[in-house]
């Protein structure tokens, strides 16, 4: 393969948890001279985000089946077959040396198409519980990687690729030693927000007063109502934003983060070296609970599932956690991070491309 520009196809879409780790790997291999093409869907976030990162993208037509009616389920085989055919056409035109499946609806047809075309398939499972698509694709994949132990019994644990600016933050000892004043609480609801955080945090802030200062990211469409709730009752310093464009800056500012426990969020909080209060989204397989559990086990975080996430419970934790303990927890979080995940995934792709 010497002298030939190697080609990677990244299959990922739908949510930031799939797309951002894929972008980290794509940029890493582009820096090593690889050519990268993204396979996505035209109506999800990757359609807008990936081109902004200077990466070409092509689309297939596929969507999820969960919650759809009987007609959609009956039509599913035809839709899936069509998506596989579209992916095969793109695959034959681009001729990748290897494909990387990061999850999302696009990975299923894309992975099958790659296998049918004889292209090595490397899968990366971001969550502590494997999704349905990756469980199926694991049977035909050349290599299977996992971010957290337990998703697959024998797959190497490589962590989640996270953004370079998060990895570049000063370690907790440098960042937090000598910091004084109210505890800085970062509340992150994700791009879609988290209603339970938006509802509870203004009351928590009102009762804690000047013991804390807050930066609360509400998610799309919730800023005005949350801002009003804070302004009507909260005396402490607070900043309310719909989105946070620079998460590294937010992590650097914070002493503790309160958030959902999506796979990428957990990995970023760990890499940044921050204590966390994780509020897993309630799902039948408890995926977000399993994502956060390793950090709770090492003493870097506390999991409060939704029935336990009460105003009193959060106030009790924030009152107990004084700065020496927060620093200790931050150091444990950073120690638990796998900071070379991008390099490990890239190495697996390079190896698979040689086979």
Curated annotation (Swiss-Prot):
GO cellular component, one term: plasma membrane
Subcellular location: Cell inner membrane
Catalysed conversion reaction: di-trans,octa-cis-undecaprenyl diphospho-N-acetyl-alpha-D-muramoyl-L-alanyl-D-glutamyl-meso-2,6-diaminopimeloyl-D-alanyl-D-alanine + UDP-N-acetyl-alpha-D-glucosamine = di-trans,octa-cis-undecaprenyl diphospho-[N-acetyl-alpha-D-glucosaminyl-(1->4)]-N-acetyl-alpha-D-muramoyl-L-alanyl-D-glutamyl-meso-2,6-diaminopimeloyl-D-alanyl-D-alanine + UDP + H(+)
UniProt function note: Cell wall formation. Catalyzes the transfer of a GlcNAc subunit on undecaprenyl-pyrophosphoryl-MurNAc-pentapeptide (lipid intermediate I) to form undecaprenyl-pyrophosphoryl-MurNAc-(pentapeptide)GlcNAc (lipid intermediate II).
Membrane-topology annotation of the record: Peripheral membrane protein
Protein name, UniProt field: UDP-N-acetylglucosamine--N-acetylmuramyl-(pentapeptide) pyrophosphoryl-undecaprenol N-acetylglucosamine transferase
Keyword Flavoprotein: no
Stored Pfam families: Glyco_tran_28_C, Glyco_transf_28
Record-linked SUPFAM superfamilies: UDP-Glycosyltransferase/glycogen phosphorylase
Entry's EC annotation: 2.4.1.227
Species whose genome carries this gene: Photorhabdus laumondii subsp. laumondii (strain DSM 15139 / CIP 105565 / TT01) (Photorhabdus luminescens subsp. laumondii)
Family: Belongs to the glycosyltransferase 28 family. MurG subfamily.
GO BP annotations listed: carbohydrate metabolic process; cell division; cell wall organization; lipid glycosylation; peptidoglycan biosynthetic process; regulation of cell shape
CDD domains: GT28_MurG
Entry keyword set: Cell cycle, Cell division, Cell inner membrane, Cell membrane, Cell shape, Cell wall biogenesis/degradation, Glycosyltransferase, Membrane, Peptidoglycan synthesis, Transferase
Pathway(s) per entry: Cell wall biogenesis; peptidoglycan biosynthesis
Residues at which UDP-N-acetyl-alpha-D-glucosamine binds: 15-17, 127, 163, 191, 244, 263-268, 288
Organism domain of life: Bacteria
Molecular function as annotated in GO: UDP-N-acetyl-D-glucosamine:N-acetylmuramoyl-L-alanyl-D-glutamyl-meso-2,6-diaminopimelyl-D-alanyl-D-alanine-diphosphoundecaprenol 4-beta-N-acetylglucosaminlytransferase activity; undecaprenyldiphospho-muramoylpentapeptide beta-N-acetylglucosaminyltransferase activity
Enzyme class: transferase
């Amino acid at each position: 393969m010497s002298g030939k520009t190697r080609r990677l196809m990244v299959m990922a879409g739908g949510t930031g948890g799939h797309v951002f780790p894929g972008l980290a790997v794509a940029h890493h291999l582009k820096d090593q001279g690889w050519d990268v093409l993204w396979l996505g869907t035209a109506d999800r976030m990757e359609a807008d985000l990936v081109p902004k990162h200077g990466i070409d993208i092509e689309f297939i037509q596929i969507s999820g089946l969960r919650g759809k009616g009987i007609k959609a389920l009956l039509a599913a085989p035809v839709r899936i077959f069509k998506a596989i055919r579209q992916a095969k056409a793109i695959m034959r035109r681009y001729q990748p040396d290897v494909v990387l499946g990061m999850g999302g609806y696009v990975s299923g047809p894309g992975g099958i198409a790659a296998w049918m075309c004889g292209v090595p398939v490397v899968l990366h499972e971001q969550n502590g519980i494997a999704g349905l698509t990756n469980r199926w694709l694991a049977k035909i994949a050349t290599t299977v990687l996992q971010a957290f132990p337990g998703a697959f019994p024998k797959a190497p644990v490589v962590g989640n690729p996270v953004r370079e600016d998060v990895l570049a933050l000063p370690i907790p000892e440098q960042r937090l030693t000598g910091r004084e004043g109210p505890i800085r609480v970062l509340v992150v609801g994700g791009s879609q927000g988290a209603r339970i955080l938006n509802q509870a945090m203004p009351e928590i802030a009102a009762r804690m007063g000047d013991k804390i200062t807050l930066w609360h990211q509400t998610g799309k469409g919730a800023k005005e109502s949350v801002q009003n709730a804070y302004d009507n009752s909260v005396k402490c310093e607070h900043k309310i934003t719909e989105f946070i464009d620079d998460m590294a800056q937010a992590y650097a500012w914070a002493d503790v983060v309160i958030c959902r426990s999506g796979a990428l969020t957990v990995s970023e909080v760990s890499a940044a070296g921050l204590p966390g209060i994780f509020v897993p989204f309630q799902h039948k397989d408890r995926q977000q609970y399993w994502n956060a559990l390793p950090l709770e086990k090492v003493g870097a975080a506390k999991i409060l599932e939704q029935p336990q996430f009460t105003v009193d419970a959060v106030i009790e934790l924030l009152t107990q956690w004084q700065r020496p303990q927060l620093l200790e927890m931050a150091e444990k979080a950073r120690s638990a991070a796998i900071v070379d995940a991008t390099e490990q995934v890239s190495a697996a792709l390079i190896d698979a491309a040689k086979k």
